[in-house]
């Protein structure tokens, strides 16, 4: 398939610069993945679309907020992180970067995608230092500075290590999550640390030639057992966000979800066979992006682009701080 097959025209004024307030008052497009039929709701109506026994799978990764000299992407162990450094030409292996609050970082190696591996040295709590000296990394289409960094955190974020928030989860409030529990749906948490690939555009004309950047994921035995039980009983597994769907399909290629951790560069596009996920909660994605290709795989490219055309006509808000779709 060609990259241009996934192009659509989006007026810039529809790119959301701030999240809805309250979070669950964003709009929600209900999308039937078989027929392409759409309905227009609000996100707080999602609970009405859920069934008792549904399992919602959330990504609990937590953006690091570390953009001063470097952009923290993914922790790789022993106080080492994969990072992007600007300007990169000054970050040769062996370079020591000094930060405020007594934090230093030594560049140890280059990565395949233009990043670096840095080992940090510090006294005290690393997370607290980063929170104090860093700023939240935002997508390049967000031009306004956040007043409150919590705007770019899910209410359930727990595992620090992402370069960006799993943004479909931004719409959930504690109150909505409680209503979902009261409905009889279950919630399960997995972890995928969103990395460099989130910001990397597709450059190959044939999308099959695109190579995804690897990202770290983790699935607990308890999470895998809950999801496998639901699959065996014919209950729906609903991924909240494309990061959750990539985690589940990476570890579920046999139809049974495997607990554990590892790295995935899974690239989901039309023709992909889903083994775990039945439905998806997601935002509206960039033209010609891997995420638009992913949701097209859940339905068809033509039907998804038609839904996006309707979203533009109805003035839905797009991208990370924008409105949502429930693809079911």
Positions of predicted regions on the chain:
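Surface-exposed, charge/polar-rich loops and edge strands
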Residues: 1-328
């Amino acid at each position: 398939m060609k990259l241009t097959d996934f192009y659509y025209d989006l007026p810039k004024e529809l790119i959301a610069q701030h999240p809805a307030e309250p979070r669950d008052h964003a709009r929600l497009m209900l999308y039937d993945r078989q027929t392409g039929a759409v309905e227009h709701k609000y996100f707080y109506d999602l609970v009405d679309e859920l069934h008792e026994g549904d399992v919602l799978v959330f990504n609990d990764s937590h953006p690091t907020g570390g953009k001063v000299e470097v952009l923290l992407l993914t922790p790789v162990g022993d106080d080492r992180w994969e990072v992007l450094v600007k300007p990169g030409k000054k970050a040769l292996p062996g370079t020591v970067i000094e930060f405020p609050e007594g934090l230093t970082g030594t560049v140890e190696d280059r990565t395949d995608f233009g990043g670096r591996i840095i080992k940090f040295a510090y006294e005290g709590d690393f997370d607290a230092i980063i929170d104090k000296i860093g700023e939240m990394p935002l997508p390049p289409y967000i031009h306004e500075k956040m007043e409150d960094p919590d705007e770019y955190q899910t209410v359930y974020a727990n595992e620090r290590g992402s370069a960006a928030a799993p943004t479909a989860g931004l719409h959930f409030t504690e109150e909505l999550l409680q209503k979902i529990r009261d409905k009889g749906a279950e919630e399960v948490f997995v972890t995928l640390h969103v990395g460099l690939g989130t910001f990397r555009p597709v450059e190959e004309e044939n999308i099959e030639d695109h190579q995804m950047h690897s990202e770290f994921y983790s699935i607990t035995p308890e999470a895998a057992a809950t999801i496998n039980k639901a699959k065996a009983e014919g209950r729906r597994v609903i991924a909240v966000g494309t990061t959750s769907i990539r985690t589940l399909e990476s570890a579920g290629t046999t139809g049974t979800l495997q607990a554990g951790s590892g790295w995935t560069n899974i690239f989901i596009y039309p023709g992909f066979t889903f083994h775990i996920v039945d439905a998806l909660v997601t935002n509206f994605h960039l033209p010609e992006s891997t995420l638009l290709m992913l949701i097209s795989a859940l339905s068809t490219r033509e039907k998804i682009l038609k839904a996006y055309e309707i979203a533009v006509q109805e003035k839905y808000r797009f991208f990370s701080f924008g409105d949502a779709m429930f693809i079911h």
